[in-house]
Amino acid sequence: MTDIRDPELPGLLLRTERDALIPLLRARPDDDFALRTACPGWTVRHVLAHCSAALIRVVEGRVEAGGFTPEENDRDIAERADLSHQQIVDELERGMTEAGPVIAAAAHRWYDGIALGEWVHAGDVREALGVPGAYEGEGLAPALALLAGLTRVRKAQPLLARLDGHDAPLVLGADSPEPAVYTGSAATLIRLVAGRPLTGTRYELSGAREADLLFFG
């Protein structure tokens, strides 16, 4: 299967998520930023600081080879220790607004994965805040399109995803005459590939194990 990159898709995803997430964050009390998330050791504030730092590094051309290591992530979060919660939200809004054109201009898909990861982290924040539909919303369609392209390029586990409410299946991973088959909601698929909690979900998976679908964590 051939796959043509849509360079505008990451920016669309980031702007769509910006318009949903930023107003939500501005309306939350300070105590909510101390809530724990699905990311081990990280609160809502930690996740937001990581996301804003990652996007600003993209905008300013400061992404080093090898990506975002745990040490770099910890450093980015520590550097924002003196910022207020809303200052971090301000920086995140800037990153979600300005990173799209930079990602579109890149001659590779690596930055596309950053945009998708930001959207997943936004879901982590929503879930910690108790907002329904954590990994759903207006950004789900572009997120699925990005996921499909990235998994094919990186030759991930072949998977035919039969998603609830979708007429056509979503094809993920390397070309294969016998892909694994997933049947369930798109939001649960996101949880599977991102290694997020599956408590209370329903789905069917044949031809692969849950661990085989983990694309990023």
Features from the language model and the residues they span:
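Short, helix-capping/interhelical loops that line the mouth of catalytic, cofactor-
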Residues: 1-9, 53-104, 131
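Structured surface interface patches that mediate subunit assembly and partner/cofactor docking
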Residues: 1-9, 63-70, 104-217
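Active-site-proximal cofactor/substrate-binding loop regions of enzyme domains
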Residues: 9-13, 21-23, 31, 39-59
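A non-catalytic, amphipathic alpha-helix used as a structural packing/dimerization or gating element
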Residues: 16, 20, 91-94
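Helix-loop segments that flank and shape redox-cofactor active sites
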Residues: 23-42, 101-109
